[in-house]
Regions:
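CBM-like, beta-strand-rich accessory domains located in the C-terminal region of large
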Residues: 1-184
Length: 184
């Protein structure tokens, strides 16, 4: 039983001479389960690829980062640097890890047993940051409106066109078990 929906987005900006493409697919694996596949490519077209960032926010009360073995991801206290730009000051760094192997992140909603599990294959020259961002006053759940939003940033210190960011997201909980074990 498989159904899918595919969406492709293409972004070109003249301010920084970059081209970005995102492909997002929704895959239904059963009448009650499914997952999302996100592939994001980024290329600086008129200069040096210093770095590219992939950012994901998930509503909820927190996140936990794990290696595929199930062990917690070893995190250091290295924060995002001030050269990242003005918008990055809205993030609080909870930890970071350089060049991790394949890993997953478990985001928990915190008001019931709802989770989002994010699987990310390894990539060279990457630093993964566990972050909190500002609260989102528009959440449908009032108890979450004043809490920081759990987030992740993956910084790749090279081109991200031939080596794109890939993430697979699987919602689970409230009786639905996580089906995905790894992504390579």
């Amino acid at each position: 039983y498989h159904q899918y929906v595919d969406a492709v987005n293409h972004f070109h900006t003249s301010e920084i001479k970059a081209e970005q493409r995102r492909m997002l697919s929704i895959i239904r694996s059963s009448p009650h389960t499914g997952y999302y596949v996100d592939i994001f490519r980024s290329d600086v077209t008129d200069g040096e690829d210093r770095y590219h960032d992939y950012i994901y926010h998930n509503m909820g009360t927190g996140s936990e980062f794990f290696l595929l073995s199930g062990q917690p991801m070893p995190m250091s206290a290295s924060p995002l640097d001030s050269l990242s730009g003005k918008g990055y000051s809205y993030f609080t760094t909870l930890g970071s890890c350089e060049n991790p192997d394949n890993f997953y992140v478990d985001y928990h909603l915190g008001i019931d047993d709802t989770h989002m599990r994010m699987f990310v294959p390894t990539g060279k020259g990457r630093t993964v940051y566990q972050l909190n961002s500002l609260f989102n006053h528009r959440y449908y759940e009032p108890s979450l409106r004043t809490l920081p939003v759990p987030a992740l940033l993956i910084r790749q210190k090279s081109e991200a066109w031939d080596h794109p960011f890939i993430a697979v997201y699987e919602p689970y909980g409230n009786g639905a078990k996580s089906q995905i074990r790894s992504v390579y």
